């Protein structure tokens, strides 16, 4: 399966975030429905953006800031997935040492060699596969806790799933309302499954053999061409790093399992 590395998905998402932030600012009734509380007349809705925050929008009223993480579903909740994690920082841990080292080696050894793209892709896929094969339950839990559970819980970030096709917004007030958090409290044993037997850089995260729709992937954020320096220098994606994605598949199923969900 091919994934975009030109930034178009990100740009589309940001555009939607800006629109909704403006909608919340211009429609007090809508904003109050989203955060499920009364707002002051001088409340402020603001687009945050960037990659250093989990929240995409904030709504501030009477000294209280409501932080919102937005997941856009343009074709509806029954199609595709959304990202919980999409970060190269996750690969700084010891678990991904061999992956990082291979990227560094290939970046130098095959620099500018266009005919080596597929060879390097295979090398990286094989190493990603081996890394995922070797990951323990505690290592996976460490990734989920550090990059999903703690940021959402400690910063009190709510989750909005924006179903554009049906003009509905699903509001989840806390990570504590999710099935993932229930498994976190029980520290359910995790295994990584490869149902097709063919996936190299992707695994389904199973919680005591139960599939809740979470998938972990180890990918290059800008593609192999960028890694080898054979993209145009004018391109903003002129380099590539190993990146970890944790994606939520079966979004409709995820929503059904959330407690106290509100639909706006």
Task: Give the predicted meaning of each segment.
Residues 1-55, 60-66, 71-264:
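Short, positively charged
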């Amino acid at each position: 399966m091919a994934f975009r590395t030109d930034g178009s998905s990100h740009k589309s998402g940001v555009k939607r975030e800006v629109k909704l932030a403006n909608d919340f600012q211009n429609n007090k009734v809508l904003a109050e429905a989203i955060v499920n509380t009364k707002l002051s007349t001088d409340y402020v809705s603001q687009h945050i953006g960037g990659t250093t925050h989990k929240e995409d929008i904030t709504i501030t009223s009477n000294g209280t800031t409501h932080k919102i993480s937005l997941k856009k579903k343009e074709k509806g909740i029954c199609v595709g997935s959304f990202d919980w994690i999409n970060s190269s920082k996750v690969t700084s841990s010891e678990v991904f040492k061999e992956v990082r080292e291979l990227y560094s080696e290939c970046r130098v050894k095959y620099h500018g060699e266009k005919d080596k793209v597929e060879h390097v892709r295979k090398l990286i896929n094989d190493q990603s596969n081996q890394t995922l094969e070797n990951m323990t339950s505690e290592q996976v839990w460490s990734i989920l806790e550090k990059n999903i559970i703690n940021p959402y819980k400690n910063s009190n970030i709510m989750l909005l799933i924006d179903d554009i096709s049906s003009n509905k917004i699903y509001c989840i007030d806390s990570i504590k309302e999710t099935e993932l958090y229930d498994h976190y409290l029980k520290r359910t044993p995790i295994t990584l499954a490869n149902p097709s037997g063919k996936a190299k850089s992707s695994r389904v995260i199973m919680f005591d053999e139960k599939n809740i729709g979470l998938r972990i992937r180890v990918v290059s954020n800008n593609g192999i061409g960028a890694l080898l320096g054979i993209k145009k220098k004018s391109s903003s994606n002129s380099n590539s790093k190993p990146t970890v994605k944790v994606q939520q598949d079966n979004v409709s199923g995820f929503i059904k399992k959330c407690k106290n969900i509100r639909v706006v």
